[in-house]
Amino acid sequence: MEKSRKILVGVLLFTASVAICLAQHWSYGLQPGGKRNAENLVESFQEIANEMESLGEGQKAECPGSYQHPRLSDLKETMASLIEGEARRKEI
């Protein structure tokens, strides 16, 4: 019985190691295949950043919540007036 368990565990470990070794390799630029080159890392990170910025700009125009800037400025003004009011109270 114990011999069959050892064989089963061995087969499972072998199968898992083969599956891991044959898995698809993805590089830093999220492009399949290729080796990871330290010289190209900066370029791939810049490419990802540019893609994220372009996606963010597209979503800002389409997003219904893009009108939050007036709310944010109103909140800042309210906080500033509260801070000024607290400062005046402390002076008295």
UniProtKB/Swiss-Prot annotation:
Q: Name positions with the PTM Glycine amide.
A: 33
Where does it localize?
Secreted
The protein's superkingdom reads Eukaryota
> Mind listing the UniProt keywords for this protein, alphabetically?
Amidation, Cleavage on pair of basic residues, Hormone, Pyrrolidone carboxylic acid, Secreted, Signal
Which GO terms of the molecular function aspect are on file? gonadotropin hormone-releasing hormone activity; gonadotropin-releasing hormone receptor binding
Q: Which GO terms describe its cellular component?
A: axon; extracellular region; extracellular space; perikaryon
Name a single GO biological process: luteinizing hormone secretion
Q: Indicate the secretion signal residues.
A: 1-23
Q: Coiled-coil ranges per the record?
A: none
Q: Report the residues modified as Pyrrolidone carboxylic acid.
A: 24
Which InterPro entries is this protein grouped with?
Answer: GnRH, Gonadoliberin, Gonadoliberin_I_precursor
Q: What does this protein do?
A: Stimulates the secretion of gonadotropins.
Q: Which family does it belong to?
A: Belongs to the GnRH family.
Question: What is the protein named?
Answer: Progonadoliberin-1
Q: Which organism is it from?
A: Gallus gallus (Chicken)
